Amino acid sequence: MEAAERARLGVVLDPLTGHEQYVNRLAIPYLTKSGVVDIRFRSIGNEEPRYMGLTGATTHLYNVGAFFRASSYICICEGEIDTITLDYVCNIPAVGVPGVNNWKKHYTRLLADFDKVFLFADGDNAGYEFGKSLARELSNLIVIQAPEGEDVNTLYRTHGADFFKEKIAGAQ
């Protein structure tokens, strides 16, 4: 619950006019020091699409506050929920990409000065390809590929926070 509060997650129950499509979805705000710059909505059940954004909004890195908390390394996750798990639950600085197809070239400049950048890639073809692509852009990248069908969230539920800390320590 503390992680949800820190991430300022909410559920849309009484939407504003024109936002009825977000009812009963998890609201995930994109926060900066200036305030909310975007909100994405995730289905709580099996509704499709799983994720929805505000009409006309552009994509951003999620959890940019991690840049101010990180020291020599930072992690990248696929998606907001995995980022919340790694950063707010495991206390490992992480930013998130809202889907591997939403990576923007200028993000590499934000990550270039870290000694190490760890990509916790999902255990699917998209995660594998994302790791290969990002490795061409970031010389300081270390890809930690999840097993087939796994991601940060499922690995946390199975192995706990120490799993990620050990992966990072073993790669340094």
Where are these regions (language model features)?
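Acidic beta-strand-to-loop metal/phosphate-binding motif
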Residues: 76, 114-126, 145
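Short, acidic/turn-prone active-site loops that include or flank metal/cofactor-
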Residues: 97-103, 122-125, 146-149
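Short, surface-exposed amphipathic charged segments that create phosphate/polyanion-binding patches used
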Residues: 109-114, 153-165
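Short, aromatic/basic amphipathic alpha-helical patches
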Residues: 129-138
